[in-house]
Amino acid sequence: MSIREDIERMECETLSPYATLSIHSRGRDDPEEQCDIRPVFQRDRDRILHCKAFRRLKNKTQVFLTPKGDHYRTRLSHTLEVSQNARTIAKALRLNEDLVEAIALGHDLGHTPFGHAGEFVLNGLCDESFHHNEQSVRIVEKLEKDGKGLNLTWEVRDGILNHQTRLMPHTLEGKIVRLSDKIAYINHDIDDAIRAQILTEENIPLELRKTLGFSTRQRLNTLIHNIISNSVGKDDIIMSEEVEQAMIELRKFNVRSCLQKSCGKRGRDKGKSNDRAVVLLLYGTYRASP
């Protein structure tokens, strides 16, 4: 028995009946020989971790276009926070951590430069609307490895595509990443805005702080624990109605108080000048020579 087969056996014996087992993967578009050591989702995680698009995340801003200081989030730090949150939930629910991690590490590969402002500009340039989740899938399927793609499993691509659509991922692991993404960006956008003195902790509505917590750490703890306690032993990933509604309201506060202030006026103004000029130049160049 190979090391991979031993790991797959342990998955069958220890993971939840609702987990996505490596041996039950729908496979890859181009069939490959199995690795002697790593199951399929672990191989996918490694491919994403070592691809060029993943390394480029470090220079893509999350919210602030030109942050002064090293402590503001980038797409890379956001991705790592999503992965950490998702793995914590998956481990507690005995779901497949390798699948969760692969989806989390790949979910934002298709995001634009210049944060949300860059996406705003590119959305106006494209013949069809630009969606970063679709671009993420395009990267792993067609652009990486000189056009060969990473040949990821169906489950990982499904989780990447549906982490931000009306459709839900087909696996519980994908649903975990979908919620973990929201948990991460809602909280760290507010944390960065407080650091940038755009708002203070006291600006957050009191009722939301009473429900979710009076600090970023407390809110993360509340949301993650709520998902675990409400999803354990079930074939879905859910939250309590009270906490879910509070998270929705906190997201609205985040958009209104953080995104619109940090990249709304300033971001769109820059999108009409420097950032727009850069995106226009790159778009025109690649459109002329695909």
Predicted regions and their residues:
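Short active-site segment of divalent metal-dependent hydrolases/proteases
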Residues: G110-F114, A184
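Post-HEXXH active-site segment of zinc metalloproteases
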Residues: D98, A102, G115-F130, A196-Q197
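Short alpha-helix carrying the canonical HExxH Zn2+-binding catalytic motif
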Residues: E101-G106, L179
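A short acidic, glycine/proline-enriched capping/turn motif at secondary-structure boundaries
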Residues: R87-I89, D108-H111
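Histidine-centered, transition-metal-coordinating active-site segments
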Residues: M1-T79, S83-I89, N96-E97, F130-P290
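Alpha-helical ligand/cofactor-binding cores
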Residues: L105, E119, V137
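Short glycine-enriched loops at secondary-structure junctions
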Residues: F54, G106-L109
